[in-house]
Amino acid sequence: MDFFSWVMITAGFGMAIGSLGTGIGQGLAVKSALEGVARNPGASGKILTTMMIGLAMIESLAIYVFVVAMIILFANPFQDVVLELLAK
């Protein structure tokens, strides 16, 4: 396989693992918030506000993974070095 195939596979696996972690984290956060609201409905506003801030922090992981995948695909800093090594 050539360099570009490995780049595509790496970006794909990175997005898959990052999205899996983000999805699990958000699911656990929502589960815990709903359990807290079920136990104490009076604190639902405070719990939901805290949950939304937490979800935004968790979602930032997916955004960072996406940015790294785009860098790997389109602005790979090792592309020139690898192509020179492959040409030898």
UniProtKB/Swiss-Prot annotation:
A Pfam family of this chain: ATP-synt_C
Single Gene Ontology MF annotation: proton-transporting ATP synthase activity, rotational mechanism
One of the record's GO cellular component terms: proton-transporting ATP synthase complex
Entry membrane topology: Multi-pass membrane protein
Keyword tags: ATP synthesis, Cell inner membrane, Cell membrane, CF(0), Hydrogen ion transport, Ion transport, Lipid-binding, Membrane, Transmembrane, Transmembrane helix, Transport
Main location (coarse class): membrane
Positions marked as site (Reversibly protonated during proton transport): E59
TM regions (residue ranges): 4-24, 53-73
Intracellular or extracellular location(s): Cell inner membrane
The protein's assembly and partners: F-type ATPases have 2 components, F(1) - the catalytic core - and F(0) - the membrane proton channel. F(1) has five subunits: alpha(3), beta(3), gamma(1), delta(1), epsilon(1). F(0) has three main subunits: a(1), b(2) and c(10-14). The alpha and beta chains form an alternating ring which encloses part of the gamma chain. F(1) is attached to F(0) by a central stalk formed by the gamma and epsilon chains, while a peripheral stalk is formed by the delta and b chains.
Function as written in the Swiss-Prot or TrEMBL entry: F(1)F(0) ATP synthase produces ATP from ADP in the presence of a proton or sodium gradient. F-type ATPases consist of two structural domains, F(1) containing the extramembraneous catalytic core and F(0) containing the membrane proton channel, linked together by a central stalk and a peripheral stalk. During catalysis, ATP synthesis in the catalytic domain of F(1) is coupled via a rotary mechanism of the central stalk subunits to proton translocation.
UniProt cross-references to HAMAP family, sorted A to Z: ATP_synth_c_bact
Family, per entry: Belongs to the ATPase C chain family.
PANTHER family registered for this protein in UniProt: ATP SYNTHASE LIPID-BINDING PROTEIN, MITOCHONDRIAL, ATPASE PROTEIN 9
Name used for this protein in its record: ATP synthase subunit c 2
Organism: Syntrophotalea carbinolica (strain DSM 2380 / NBRC 103641 / GraBd1)
